[in-house]
Amino acid sequence: MIDNKIPLVDLHRHLDGNVRVQTIWELGHQHGIALPADSLETLAPFVQIQGKETSLVAFLKKLDWMVAVLADLDAVQRVARENVADAALSGLDYAELRFSPYYMAMNHKLPIEGVVEAVIDGVNQGLKAHPQVKINLIGIMSRSFGVDACTAELNGLLAHRDKLVAIDLAGDELGFPGSLFNDHFKRVRDSGLNITVHAGEAAGAESMWQAIQELGATRIGHGVKAVQDPKLMEYLAKHRIGIESCPTSNLQTSTVKSLAEHPLRTFVDAGVLVCLNTDDPGVSNIDIKHEYRLAHNEMGFSAAELAKLQANGVEMAFISDSDRKALYAAKA
C-alpha cells in the first residue's frame, strides 16, 4: 500500500496522544499515581481503543490518561523521546509532532515553558538514536481551557519559536470558536510561523472559513464538514489549502458514523489537497500504514490514488523546498 519511492509522512500526529501503555504503567508506579487497572494487560483497554469502539467520551478519557502520568519534566522528555522512536519504527520518513503544553502541564502544575523545553529536548534525544526519521514540532493552543490559558500557552511556545514550524488551535470547537483567538493568531503570523487549525470537526464549514480567512490557516485538521459547502470545497482546491485527514480517528470519535460517510473520497474527487494521518496513534492503536490499508481495503482507493495521497503529504509539509527534495532524494 505504500509507495517506496515517495517519502512517508504523518503531519497530524499528537505527541500527547501517543504515550505507550508500558510508559503509562511505569510512570504511574514511579510517581504513585493511581491507575485504573492492576496490570499492564488490564490497563490497555483504559488507554487504547479496543476493537470498534466509537465514542468521543471514551476516546477523550483514554487521551486524558496519557497526560495524567506526566508528573515531572523528565516524564515529558521521555514521552517526547519515545514519540520519535515510534515514528521511526512505524516507517515514517518525516513527521510533524504536535503538542499542547498546557494540556501536558495541567495535571501536575508543571511550568508551561518547561514542558515546551522538555519536549524539544526529548525529541532531540530521540533523533540522535533514530536519525533516519526527520521531525518537526507544532505547538497547540488548547481552546477548551479558555482564552487566558491559550495566551499562557502561546507565550511558552513563542519563547521557542525557532524550534517550531507551526501553531495549531485544538479542543472544543463549538464552545470556543476561532473568533476568540484572532489576537493570538496575529501574534503567530507576526512570528512567521505556519498555521494549521482543527476545524470542521465538531463545528460546521463556517469554522473552516473563519480559520482560513481570519486566523490565516493554510492547513486544516480534519475538515470533515467542508463537504457541506460547495463554495468552500472550490476555495480549498483553488488555494491549495491542505486537509489533514484522519479516517480512523474520525470513526472512533463518531465524527463520522461510518467510513462510507467519510469525506476523503469527496476531497480527492474535488481536487482538494488532502493527506492521510494518524491523529492520536497511541489512543487509536494504529500506525500510518494502517490508514493506507484502510483507505485501500475499506474505502476503495487504488494504489495510484494512495501514491497521490502520500505525495500530497510531502507537498503539505511545513518544510522548505530543499528539505522536500532531500526527502525524495533519500528514497531514490
Curated annotation (Swiss-Prot):
EC category name: hydrolase
Site (Important for catalytic activity): H222
Location of the active site: E201 (proton donor)
Cofactor note text: Binds 1 zinc ion per subunit.
Annotated EC: 3.5.4.4
SUPFAM superfamilies for the chain: Metallo-dependent hydrolases
Residues binding substrate: H14, D16, G171, D280
GO CC annotations, alphabetized: cytosol
Disulphide bridges, residue numbers: none
Entry keyword Hydrolase: yes
Entry keyword set: Hydrolase, Metal-binding, Nucleotide metabolism, Zinc
Record-linked PANTHER family: ADENOSINE DEAMINASE
UniProt record similarity statement: Belongs to the metallo-dependent hydrolases superfamily. Adenosine and AMP deaminases family. Adenosine deaminase subfamily.
Protein name as catalogued: Adenosine deaminase
Organism: Shewanella amazonensis (strain ATCC BAA-1098 / SB2B)
